[in-house]
From Swiss-Prot:
UniProt keyword annotation of Glycosyltransferase present: yes
Record organism: Cupriavidus taiwanensis (strain DSM 17343 / BCRC 17206 / CCUG 44338 / CIP 107171 / LMG 19424 / R1) (Ralstonia taiwanensis (strain LMG 19424))
Domain remark text: Lacks the C-terminal regulatory region which is replaced by HisZ.
UniProt-recorded name of the protein: ATP phosphoribosyltransferase
GO molecular function: ATP binding; ATP phosphoribosyltransferase activity
Length: 224
């Protein structure tokens, strides 16, 4: 690892992704007395300082948060349950459901498509998703025959252009589905974001981490 990236032994590094998770994590940080001093939406920096000189924030892709924490490039991070389900929890400790960035992972199909009948008839369905592992496990448990198509974005486009019969994606309000003439037919799992901690950091930096974890737990309990 580059020496320029390495934190001092007493410094804590928190991995966050831009967007909703970052925004909804800010009040939890403030509950721990920590304020991020730059906005990742306007700053070009990927390592952001905070009001606590011993804590810094690294901005990474949502799907990369567990990797940074697992390998110790970050001591702790915030990741969606969807990411953790898809990528596994090796080397991670996930002590707290933060009750933020809540949504659900669901199966959606074009309006008018009889999904239940297709399943009953044993039809083989093409399903577009970025959650291939999670979708595979879900459909296998239900005995549904599927061909999974890995996409990285714009899942709703799949059925519109004939790429897939259905999609598996995250749904919050459902407005994007409706705008693309899709309907939610099956909920797979409720999603929220979790605090994940590097197992080695939990042992070696427990004294520094414990007050922050306690503050996160208290603040997130109020959101439940």
């Amino acid at each position: 690892m580059s020496p320029a990236f390495n934190a001092s032994p007493n410094q804590l590094t928190l991995a966050l992704s831009k967007g909703r998770i970052f925004t909804e994590t800010l009040p939890l940080l403030e509950a721990a007395g920590i304020r991020v001093t730059e906005d990742p939406e306007t700053s070009r920096k990927l390592i952001l300082p905070t009001s606590d000189p011993a804590v810094r924030v690294v901005i990474v892709r949502a799907s990369d948060v567990p990797t940074y924490v697992q390998y110790g490039a970050a001591d702790f991070g915030v990741a969606g349950k969807d990411v953790l389900m898809e990528n596994g929890m090796a080397g991670l400790y996930a002590p707290i459901d933060l009750n933020i960035a809540r949504c659900r992972m669901s199966v959606a199909v074009p309006a008018g498509f009889d999904y239940a009948n297709a399943v009953r008839q044993g039809a083989r369905l093409a399903v577009a998703t970025k959650y291939v592992q999670t979708a595979r496990e879900h459909f296998a448990k239900k005995g549904v025959h599927v061909d999974l198509i890995k996409l990285y974005g714009s899942m709703e486009l799949g059925p519109l252009v004939g790429l897939s019969d259905a999609i598996v994606d995250l749904v919050s309000t459902g407005s994007t589905l409706r705008a693309n003439n899709l309907v939610e037919v099956e909920e797979i799992v409720q999603i929220s974001s979790r605090l994940v901690v590097n197992q080695a950091a939990l042992k070696l930096k427990r004294e520094r981490l414990a007050p922050i974890l306690d503050a996160f737990e208290r603040a997130s309990a109020a959101l439940a």
